Amino acid sequence: MATGQRLMRAIRVSEFGGPEVLKLQSDVAVPIPEEHQVLIKVQACGVNPVDTYIRSGTYSRKPRLPYTPGLDVAGLIEAVGERVSAFKKGDRVFTTSTVSGGYAEYALAADHTVYKLPGELDFQKGAAIGVPYFTAYRALLHSACAKAGESVLVHGASGGVGLAACQIARACCFKVLGTAGTEEGQRVVLQNGAHEVFNHREDINIDKIKKSVGEKGIDVIIEMLANVNLSNDLNLLSQGGRVIIVGSKGPVEINPRDTMTKESSIKGVTLFSSTKEEFQQFAAALQAGMEIGWLRPVIGSQYPLEKVAQAHEDLTHSSGAAGKVVLLLK
């Protein structure tokens, strides 16, 4: 390490496994931005389900060990690398990805993954925009090609992506239905765009949903837990209906015939298949949402950096929790 190198606290993962592999270190070198990169002094960092999949080693994209997790940071520009013209020191920003990892006091990010954070949104809310809102927008409008007037069911609507999907769907003039597993979750879903909400812990909710939409069925289902719901989803769809899979924790058995009569489709989505141009499109739409006011991130549990293992544990096992899980670093 070079003499005078600044040090920071950061979470490091040296092996894949459970939450216990998340180790806080206080002697990690502060990264230096290169061309088209910025260094962000992190104020808050979102914790996403995908973070837990990557940490466990079960995700298709495996980082080189050791690594620092974290994609969604919000904070202040500390320094900029060469050929960066859109940002300057002190700018309030949020990200959709990082180069060095967001569970740290400072994070590097490529300049095309960084966006201005409006003054009316605090850093916790800024850390809840990136992956949740960009994923929800991609799922609804890019993958499902949903149109005004269509019905949308968000399965698992009380989490970060689910609430983002409800807000976007309502702003785009869809009929919005949501499911959640707790009374608090159902209340939050109704407050954030859903016309109706159902308890997904009740077997009878399938019949209730069918009654709500009538014989036509549901046009689009945004699915957060496909291994549990996919078979029922296919029976809820309209003619030509689409299930967009955002999350799944395991395999599931379905009857392909359920897709044939209705000519329905099942499509997976991952934010990181988006091109730079698509990210720009998503960002423009979401920036309008911030300006108009329909984009309102909901914050759930908040943890200091040293409690990150607990944050991962709670995110994995506390189904029905409402809002985005956030780490605080200020």
Curated annotation (Swiss-Prot):
GO terms for molecular function: mRNA 3'-UTR binding; NADPH binding; NADPH:quinone reductase activity; zinc ion binding. The keyword Ligase does not apply. It catalyses: 2 a quinone + NADPH + H(+) = 2 a 1,4-benzosemiquinone + NADP(+). GO terms for biological process: xenobiotic catabolic process. The modification Phosphoserine is found at S248. The modification N-acetylalanine is found at A2. GO terms for cellular component: cytosol. Belongs to the zinc-containing alcohol dehydrogenase family. Quinone oxidoreductase subfamily. Does not have alcohol dehydrogenase activity. Binds NADP and acts through a one-electron transfer process. Orthoquinones, such as 1,2-naphthoquinone or 9,10-phenanthrenequinone, are the best substrates (in vitro). May act in the detoxification of xenobiotics. Interacts with (AU)-rich elements (ARE) in the 3'-UTR of target mRNA species and enhances their stability. NADPH binding interferes with mRNA binding. Homotetramer. This is Quinone oxidoreductase. It comes from Lama guanicoe (Guanaco).
